[in-house]
Design a protein with these regions (language model features):
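Conserved, single-site charged/polar hotspot
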Residues: 1-5, 9-202
Length: 202
């Protein structure tokens, strides 16, 4: 699924990244988003084909072969230190990471960090990805599982995520898969940029 952005946020339209661009779930709904993230629906970008991935990924990215669904695990101390380091805010022990708002592609645009010292809502998606990773999470389309809870404090957090990037426009992996399947370039571009006109200017 992707979001397309024209000039303002209200113009975003969600479409599936597969042959059937209709009948997709409302990923702004938390229960629906959670179910979608935990499954692996058919999509052009759902591939682990190393040949295709090598066409669009840098060498260091090729260590990962599944960008469609992924997981990251943090201990309590790792997550608390990371969030403190990246945000500059001491939340104390991290009690929960609560989804507040999702966009049409299921990506979180507002996330509540609940700590033993304070609670704060952060956003948008790029800031969420930055705060929860030493570099960046693959995307902000994720759900969080709290594990080994002792006296109300989780000792481990598992982030289950979907996709790679901000979810707007052309998906490089999906476009490469479409090309490998024989789709002409015009059809690939119009799949990702619905309503666009392709004209020769020379």
């Amino acid at each position: 699924r992707r979001q397309r952005q024209m000039c303002i946020r209200d113009s975003l339209t969600a479409l599936r990244d597969d042959k059937n661009e209709k009948d997709f779930p409302d990923l702004k709904n938390e229960d629906t988003a959670r179910q979608w993230i935990y499954t692996s629906p058919t999509a052009f970008c759902n591939t682990t084909d190393k040949k295709i991935l090598s066409q669009v990924l840098n060498n260091y990215d090729q260590e990962t072969t599944d960008f469609y669904r992924w997981s990251v695990v943090y201990s309590q101390s790792e997550l608390a230190h990371l969030i403190h380091e990246k945000s500059g805010i001491d939340f104390g022990e991290i009690i929960d990471l609560k989804p507040i708002e999702r966009g049409t592609s299921g990506r979180l645009v507002r996330l509540q960090i609940q700590g033993s010292k304070q609670t704060l809502i952060i956003g948008k998606e790029l800031e969420i990805r930055r705060v929860l990773s030493p570099s960046h999470l693959y995307s902000s389309a994720f759900v969080v599982e709290r594990e080994d809870i002792q006296n109300g404090i989780p000792q481990r957090f598992v982030i289950h995520g979907a996709g790679w990037g901000h979810g707007v426009g052309l998906c490089q992996i999906g476009a490469a898969v479409m090309g490998e399947q024989g789709y002409p370039y015009r059809e690939i571009l119009l799949h990702y940029f619905v309503g666009a006109n392709i004209e020769k200017l020379y």
